[in-house]
Design a protein with these regions (language model features):
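Walker A/P-loop
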Residues: 28
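ATP-binding Walker
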Residues: 25
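Hydrophobic anchor at the beta1->P-loop junction of P-loop NTPases
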Residues: 19
Length: 233
């Protein structure tokens, strides 16, 4: 673990923390633990890309241009449900739930997430999320490097691919699904390679990030470390 150096005081600035890292390191769990402690909102950046996937299928949109027009003509509101520990999206006054959480939507989301025009459109929504409300914990892969470079605290979580594969396997088993560890590990390693080497917003720690390896840490231990650094600000 490497501590982030002492920064300027918060003053009246809008409070933002970012949590970046690959899949399976505990970003979402940490985000909600911190949000509950601080009374802040949570931004799940991946959910917005799932919205893109959902819209492309629902409206039969095929090009980034069509999707961006659809986004601009839609009423999109981001919601934090601390009780359920989930982020939700309200689209044209309807809260979307399971509609965003299926493999077809995820596949489309991954496809369009590689497009720079789509990412710029999503960034505008992310930047304005909860803008005039309480503080924000932003969970993603480029939150500290691209979306909120001014964040008062930037956290980058990491863990070995073997540990992350084991965590994912346990999640799937809890849902009654069969698991092939070799395949899970290969998928995680392939995703890491793609995230790190992509041309647009590659996965990497932001300058001055608090780096934490969660391989052998509990969520409480990670939360304690982050809060210690936050209190130094």
């Amino acid at each position: 673990i490497r501590d982030q150096p002492r920064s300027r005081g918060l003053g009246d600035v809008y409070k933002r923390q970012t949590i970046d890292g690959p899949s399976g390191v505990g970003k979402g769990t940490l985000a909600f633990s911190l949000a509950e402690k601080l009374g802040w909102n949570v931004l799940d950046s991946g959910l917005l890309y799932r919205l893109i996937g959902f819209l492309s299928l629902k409206e039969k949109l095929e090009t980034p241009h069509e999707i961006i027009i659809c986004i601009n003509n839609s009423k999109i509101k981001l919601l934090t449900n601390l009780k359920k520990r989930i982020c939700e999206i309200e689209l044209d006054d309807k809260v979307l739930g399971k509609e965003l959480r299926n493999e077809d939507v995820a596949s489309k989301a991954s496809e369009f997430a590689k497009n720079s025009e789509i990412r710029n459109a999503i960034m505008k929504i992310q930047r304005n999320a909860y803008e005039k409300e309480k503080g924000l914990i932003a969970d993603g892969r480029d939150m500290g490097t691209v979306i909120f470079p001014e964040a008062v605290l930037k956290v980058f979580l990491q863990a070995s691919s073997e540990v992350r594969a084991e965590r994912r396997a346990n999640q799937l088993k809890e849902k009654g699904m069969s698991v092939i560890m070799h395949d899970l590990l290969r998928q995680i390693q392939q995703r890491d390679k793609e995230d790190i080497n992509r041309k647009i917003s590659p996965l990497k720690p932001a300058d001055g990030s608090l780096l934490i390896d969660t391989s052998n840490l509990s969520i409480k231990e990670v939360e304690k470390r982050v809060m210690e650094n936050y209190k130094k600000l």
